[in-house]
């Protein structure tokens, strides 16, 4: 299944190399971007589970996940992590619409960093394409757990 998704999104060696460049560019901005994201989530009172207590833990987990995503070789550790994330979002009854909207907010902030970088327009285009592909994979896998049946 995942191979077909990669093929459909045309994730190749160039995309993976671009993801590492993207990681180097975005990582210094994760703190600020994630801080602003959770401030927005709290302001909109999207979930009762996003309390002041939970925020610090969520920020740290989000930074680790973002970094892991762009460095991912898409091995079992990544798949297990994204399944846990999706299941947790489902278990706290986070609507898929808020999951997608939230990821869009993050994506737009990441794109702002790309746009403001010193890279050439061609490289910026490649970085945005890579960002889109990696976020599509991440969202698709997380959201697929919403319908998954868990058997103990």
Task: Set out the residue ranges of the language-model regions.
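Short, structured coil/loop segments at alpha-helix boundaries
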Residues: 15, 44-47, 120-121
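Short linear motifs at secondary-structure transitions and domain/linker junctions
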Residues: 15-17, 82, 118
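Heme-based O2/NO sensor domains and their adjacent alpha-helical segments
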Residues: 2-5, 27-115
